[in-house]
């Protein structure tokens, strides 16, 4: 998995925006794999993507965040909270609000609370 993460990190490099969708989609099966439990590198890779929040990747980001939340709700909510705190852009909050209706119910309510506090 560590070599795979290196490859995905290259796909998700800011200079390779055309590869971002592929990189995000590649992470979902890794996260849901029972053998994988190292989420911090995933959050590190995803940070710049969530800060940019391109509209074209909304569904990919939504799927990835839902998978992360299923694996570790606390870590995922903390990651989102820290991302919102560390950016001056409104794009992440706007994108997250757009995603809300399609997220699992418990994730929706917890994310609403984070959005209320941080925006």
Task: Place the predicted regions along the sequence by residue.
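Alpha-helical scaffold domains
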Residues: 1-119
């Amino acid at each position: 998995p560590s070599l795979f993460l290196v490859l995905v990190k290259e796909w998700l490099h800011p200079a390779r925006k055309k590869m971002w969708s592929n990189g995000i989609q590649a992470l979902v099966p890794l996260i849901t794999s029972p053998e994988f439990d190292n989420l911090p590198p995933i959050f590190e890779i995803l940070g710049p993507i969530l800060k940019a929040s391109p509209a074209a990747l909304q569904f990919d980001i939504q799927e990835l965040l839902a998978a992360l939340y299923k694996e570790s709700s606390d870590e995922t909510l903390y990651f989102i909270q820290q991302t919102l705190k560390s950016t001056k852009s409104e794009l992440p909050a706007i994108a997250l609000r757009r995603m809300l209706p399609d997220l699992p119910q418990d994730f929706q309510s917890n994310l609403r609370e984070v959005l209320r506090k941080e925006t």
